[in-house]
Amino acid sequence: MAQIRIHEVNTRIENEVKVSKFLQEEGVLYEKWNISKLPPHLNENYSLTDENKAEILAVFSKEIADVSARRGYKAHDVISLSNSTPNLDELLINFQKEHHHTDDEVRFIVSGHGIFAIEGKDGTFFDVELEPGDLISVPENARHYFTLQDDRQVVAIRIFVTTEGWVPIY
């Protein structure tokens, strides 16, 4: 279950109902998908082959199709980041630059952890700390950035409005 940390006051929201309500009020789509469907050989596997990535997409194809139909998404892929990722530190520096997109940024966490820091409607940033099974859609034009948690590893399904993917606006 995702948790929220509000930056300026360092307040945490950990209750599932309160997290969902907070995100809904901020216009952030949040869903919990059944991660137990993931085959054991893909759980916490950060060295994925193309076949592994295709298998992950197949496992969650129904959920991807459902959210895509509801929200108009047209493409998806799988990304894996870990200490074995070449240039991980450089990638994280780039991910941590505050930006926005003219379409939603959608991620479903398959393994590991990630954090989206999002500017709230009142101008205060909050972290959404994500774990396996969490799906988030950062709304279009919302200022945000992404980083990893202390374990520095994540496998995520990215879902896009267009086949070209997101274009960050810094």
Curated annotation (Swiss-Prot):
Pathway involvement of the protein, from the record: Amino-acid biosynthesis; L-methionine biosynthesis via salvage pathway; L-methionine from S-methyl-5-thio-alpha-D-ribose 1-phosphate: step 5/6
Record's keyword terms, sorted: Amino-acid biosynthesis, Dioxygenase, Iron, Metal-binding, Methionine biosynthesis, Nickel, Oxidoreductase
Catalytic activity, EC: 1.13.11.54, 1.13.11.53
One Pfam family this sequence matches: ARD
Biological process annotations from GO: L-methionine salvage from methylthioadenosine; L-methionine salvage from S-adenosylmethionine
Residues the record lists as binding Fe(2+): H99, H101, E105, H144
Marked site (May play a role in transmitting local conformational changes) residue numbers: D104
Gene3D superfamilies: Jelly Rolls (2.60.120.10)
One MF term in the entry's GO annotations: iron ion binding
Record-listed Ni(2+) binding positions: H99, H101, E105, H144
Entry similarity comment: Belongs to the acireductone dioxygenase (ARD) family.
Subunit structure, interactors included: Monomer.
Function: Catalyzes 2 different reactions between oxygen and the acireductone 1,2-dihydroxy-3-keto-5-methylthiopentene (DHK-MTPene) depending upon the metal bound in the active site. Fe-containing acireductone dioxygenase (Fe-ARD) produces formate and 2-keto-4-methylthiobutyrate (KMTB), the alpha-ketoacid precursor of methionine in the methionine recycle pathway. Ni-containing acireductone dioxygenase (Ni-ARD) produces methylthiopropionate, carbon monoxide and formate, and does not lie on the methionine recycle pathway.
Protein name: Acireductone dioxygenase
Native source organism of the sequence: Bacillus anthracis
Gene it is expressed from: mtnD
